[in-house]
Curated annotation (Swiss-Prot):
It is an enzyme of class 2 (transferase). The gene is xiap. This is E3 ubiquitin-protein ligase XIAP. Monomer, and homodimer. A zinc finger (RING-type) spans 441-476. The BIR and RING-type domains are dispensable for anti-apoptotic function. It comes from Xenopus laevis. Belongs to the IAP family.
Length: 488
């Protein structure tokens, strides 16, 4: 799946070391053509992915592409930077080379205010929460960053006239479905699934576009799921996040199979169900069986799921794959769906021919304080057992130190992810850039991540930013403790 131009605010911020900039670092002039971030991002259409910096990170930091090598230019202070190196951050480098830039100063001033006040409140009489005048781009950027920061840290932002959805005419799922009249027959995905995921057809090849964030997706593959790809490529889309953006779902009688809206009718389809997952739970979650294998389909949204495992929760899997299902929303509520979307992904179990040393019986094992602590952080029980087993095998002793245990769990998790086959080949430079971006604080986008939040277990912040947060910016869970970690 390859996303097209992303018309949204991006969070990653990685970039440069040997800058070459213009003579003046002062805001003597601005380039109004690149005032909007999405316009700056569009300028990177021919920006090579081999450079050790991502186009979204540069656009977020106020830069647009000049078309010459890796040279970029700030729309506000007009400073130019090129010869990017691994390990740089776009915002950090921008601050260094152009300390008087209004765009960057707006970001700095806002962060200082947040740290001092702990709970900043936006007070702005202008529509959209942004200045009406376009004469001061630095000020507007500051407001935009303020709103973005407050959203990421779980604070409430009151915008009387939000910028979303991008395409008001496509708020109705029925209207989106009508755009697929000429949908190419070679595409493996059905229009109904795409429309339910907030996407409408652009008329170009198999390209679709989100009515809310404006993000584009194309080159669909048989294994793709519309909601999954939408969430993966545009995780900040308000529609994906479950916010009320005016989406109008189709009536259940049109959307799915009305003759399956009865629990008993769905349950009857599982009469000869040989698979390990409970059929009653599947039927309660809205699913009925189709075919001879374990393929199931929701009577309401029409979403299909298969390859069920014994420990799967049908409600959670339903919420992960098809969060827009009206039946799901009515039965479980939006909060349940949001939690499922933010839930830590289950890692594949590693197959090994070697037997691990026997661990204590589950009853005593589960009472181990280290096991309880790791589970509170979100590590899967199978992963915990595997790491403890390896420790016993290599040393003959179990863990006594929390820091060592968590460090080994993180390493094992990284190795498991690294062992997964890649969907597409990417360059060494791209891999290095992605690894660097994963380690950057998702709040300041500058310093390294060094804190894990307890009990949710999310790794998102540096020590400075973690101190001013009361809730996890990913799942909004109240932070009870902050555990310092060391990432290699």
């Amino acid at each position: 799946m390859e996303p097209q131009i992303v018309k949204f605010v991006f969070k990653e911020e990685m970039t440069c070391q040997c800058p070459k900039m213009s003579d003046s670092a002062c805001d003597v002039d601005t380039d109004q053509n690149y005032f909007e971030e999405e316009v700056r991002l569009a300028s990177f259409a021919n920006f090579s992915s081999s450079y050790p910096v991502s186009a979204p990170a540069l656009a977020r930091a106020g830069f647009y592409y000049t078309g010459d090598g890796d040279r970029v230019k700030c729309f506000s202070c007009m400073a130019m930077v090129e010869d990017w190196q691994h390990g740089d951050t776009a915002i950090g480098k921008h601050r260094k080379i152009s300390p008087n830039c209004k765009f960057i100063n707006g970001f700095n001033n806002f962060r200082s205010d947040c740290i001092q006040t702990q709970a900043p409140v936006m007070q702005n009489s202008h529509a959209n929460g942004f200045p009406n005048s376009a004469e001061d781009p630095g000020e507007k950027s500051s407001s935009e960053i303020m709103a973005d920061y407050m959203l990421r840290t779980g604070r409430v932002v009151d915008m009387s006239k939000p910028k979303y959805p991008r395409h008001m005419a496509m708020c109705s799922e029925e209207a989106r479905l009508q755009t697929f009249q000429n949908w190419p027959g070679y595409s493996p995905l059905m229009p109904k699934e795409l429309a339910n995921a907030g996407l409408f057809y652009t008329g170009i090849n198999d390209q679709v576009k989100c009515f809310c964030c404006g993000g584009k997706l194309m080159n669909w593959e048989p294994s793709d799921r519309a909601w999954t790809e939408h969430k993966k490529h545009f995780p900040e889309c308000y529609f994906v996040l479950g916010r009320d953006v005016g989406n109008v779902t189709r009536d259940a009688s049109v959307q799915g199979s009305t003759y399956m809206n009865s629990y008993n009718a769905r349950l009857e389809t599982f009469s000869s169900w040989p698979f390990p997952i409970d059929k009653e739970t599947l039927a309660k979650a809205g699913f009925y069986r189709i075919g001879d294998e374990d393929a199931t389909k929701c009577f309401s949204c029409g979403g299909m799921l298969n390859c069920w495992a014994a420990n799967d929760d049908p409600w959670e899997e339903h919420a992960k794959a098809y969060p827009g299902c009206q039946f799901l929303i009515e039965e479980k509520g939006q909060q349940f769906i949001n939690n499922a979307q933010l839930q830590r992904p289950i890692l594949h179990k590693a197959n090994s021919g070697e037997a691990s040393p026997a661990l204590p019986k589950d009853t005593s094992f589960l009472k181990n304080p280290l096991v309880i602590y790791a589970q509170q952080m979100g590590f899967p029980l199978e992963e915990i057992k595997k790491v403890m087993g390896q420790k016993l095998k290599t040393t003959g002793n179990n863990y006594t130190c929390v820091e060592e245990f968590v460090s080994d769990l993180l390493c094992a998790q990284s190795e498991t992810i690294a062992d997964k086959p890649m969907k597409r080949e990417i360059s060494i430079e791209e891999k290095l850039r992605q690894l660097e971006e994963e380690k950057v604080c998702k709040v300041c986008m500058d310093r390294r991540i060094t804190i894990v939040f307890i009990p949710c277990g999310h790794l998102v912040a540096c020590a400075v930013c973690a101190d001013v947060l009361d809730k996890c910016p990913i799942c909004c869970t109240i932070i009870e403790r902050r555990q310092k970690i060391f990432m290699s």
